[in-house]
Amino acid sequence: MLVGMTALAIDFSDVAAAAERLAGVAHRTPVLRSRTADERCGAQVFFKAEHLQRMGAFKFRGAYNALVQFSPAQRRTGALAF
């Protein structure tokens, strides 16, 4: 993953920590399947229905995870999203 121009390595512990921060905050959304997509791709295709997340925002998990990790100085400055 790139942040600015810096490459960041993400491992399972990062994913587990993010899941812990999101526990009880993010809705559990379903994973959907499509036989048509499977046939066209020649593989099993899974769709995570994040559009069913709070506020219909598919980026809720990432945004929330980033905001709760803000330092006190970053919290005073705030965040802008569009």
Descriptions of predicted regions:
Residues L2-F82:
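PLP-dependent amino-acid enzyme catalytic core
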